[in-house]
């Protein structure tokens, strides 16, 4: 009946978030999350809606408040057979 999701592809990326520092201070962390989403969508050829940001990655981006997201994040990306892409912070 229901098909199990299988991992089709696994990759690691270091995503540079320095462009988030171009926008105003009160929008940087939210913009950085969007940068991650767009970067992964472009590299794995999926729609940005299909990219799911993991909780640990989200906490890492927001850890120093909205004004000071990290300059880079090291992530692990898994693409599933149904087209969904999950992004997690690398340990």
UniProtKB/Swiss-Prot annotation:
This is Large ribosomal subunit protein eL31. GO terms for cellular component: cytosolic large ribosomal subunit. Keywords: Ribonucleoprotein, Ribosomal protein. It holds the Pfam family Ribosomal_L31e. It comes from the Archaea. It comes from Pyrobaculum islandicum (strain DSM 4184 / JCM 9189 / GEO3). SMART domains: Ribosomal_L31e. InterPro entries: Ribosomal_eL31 (IPR000054), Ribosomal_eL31_CS (IPR020052), Ribosomal_eL31_dom_sf (IPR023621). One of its GO terms (biological process) is cytoplasmic translation. CDD domains: Ribosomal_L31e (cd00463). One of its GO terms (molecular function) is structural constituent of ribosome. Belongs to the eukaryotic ribosomal protein eL31 family. The keyword Ribonucleoprotein applies.
